[in-house]
Amino acid sequence: MLYQAKALHGYKLNGRDGEIGKIKEFYFDDHYWTIRYLVADSGNWLTNRQVLISPHALGIVNKDAQNIAINLTKKQIEDSPPLNSEEPVSRQFEQDYYNYYMLPSYWDSPFMLGQYSSPSPSMSIRGKLPKSTFGPKTWDPHLRSTHAVSGYHIQVKDGDGGHVEDFMIDDETWIIRYLIINTKNWWEGKKVLVSPRWIKSVDWEESKVFVNLSREAIKQSPEYIEGSPLNREYEAALHQHYNFQGYWVNESPQNNSP
């Protein structure tokens, strides 16, 4: 199912021995446009540090109860590699994090999220893999915050196309399937969806996303009504409008992630 990122903010994260916090935002990698961490607001439990949860540990999203089951205990999270609340995520931290939970690293492993039908059982075991050779200040330049990228300007072939308002996330693979674009910058404020696959480039310093579409194509695009569920019929019409093949055509349930 596809969820708006902002709609998931505030969802409770229920660990094996109680609530560990609520979803605050998401970190995604800008190469595969896949969520790599949920950032949890742990309240007064773990202060002055970021609580990052890998999608490998996530169970089913319960929309009615607005919570997600986490295959972790509070003790595991408390003993995990710490990251200061003001500190950027470094590759050294990620290596330590993935070693601790004995997870295959997404940056150099053929085993990617989407190949597991349930949270990895290794999340319950502390890893004892070799220490990383990355330097302590090797920041990961490819991790982006959904909060920070919201508001980025969309540049189409013939001018301003609007701005990024939110993201549509697939809760089975945790891939960002669409960016929600608000066109009020230049048109009537209609909201449309744009797939990351249609993005030509991103200027992270200038906060601009360049898309190989025209204003007229966006005008004629099927409108996205905020809060309405997305079905395959709508997605098919959207892809047909832009003459693109649907992402689901070449994906299988056991191999649907980059």
Regions found by a protein language model. Name each.
Residues 1-258:
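Peripheral interaction segments used for macromolecular assembly
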